[in-house]
Amino acid sequence: MKRQLLLCLAIISFLSNSGIAQKAKIAAADKKYNSYAYIDAIQTYERLAEKGYQSVEMFEKLGNAYYFNSDFEKAAQSYEKLYQLQSELAPEYYYRYAQSLKATGKEKEAATILAKFENKSSDDSRSKRLKNNTDYLEDIKANVGIYTIENAGINSKYSDYGSTIVDNKLIFTSARDTGGVGQRKHAWTGEHFTNLYAAGVNGELIPSNPVRYDANVNSKFHEATPVFTKDGNTMYFTRNNYLDGKKGKDANKVTLLKIYKATLVNNRWTNVTELPFNSNNFSTAHPALSPDEQTLYF
């Protein structure tokens, strides 16, 4: 009898400790998620799921973490588990689930989920666009072949985007690792912070080997999406809220994005300043100039 009692107490103690450990792991993952460290959060959520833990909140966050990193296949899998646990979801989860399904080629399944999104959010502008253009996929297919898209030959396995041409150079954004001291990774994506790169282009606009762009512009945080005036002497670009060695944060201690301006002097970019409409409390990003250079869109 005494042995049985001890065994029962041992089992209760084990289950109690396991529950406490599980709650601690969930709390740690949630903390990572709430600070946008999605890659770390994903690893913990996945380990919990592998051990059989399931909750609506966890699969909401796991799906979002994949969705915000454009891993739509795994996002769809997570949202599917969420949908199995609770078929009545907030409209945004129907939308993200449908977009993830669509991105993985499951158009019929996506249409079913989108219908639920439309029913729950008839006033949403996305819902209205879907209702007004139900055959948008057919429109896209009808235009296939109008343009020829080729790999530029300078892409890496990381994010490469936000390109423009100035002075026979292709200037673009990349998260590639080209070495150097202090290489840092972004907790959101698990990739290196993006910098600007330059690749010479020939008469056929074929780029050559890219190199890191001007050190006065690139910092230890994100730089992206440059745009230049026609004379090539002024550049507008996106950067994390960081200038002169000082990092700005919003009320939640998050470093957002701002648009900066730089001036070319003696072939070096100088006078990096932020534009006056920036704020610590919201992001401004991805500038574009009108043809007459009188208006900056962002």
Give the location of each predicted region.
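Alpha-helical segment of the N-proximal tetratricopeptide repeat
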Residues: 22-47, 51-52
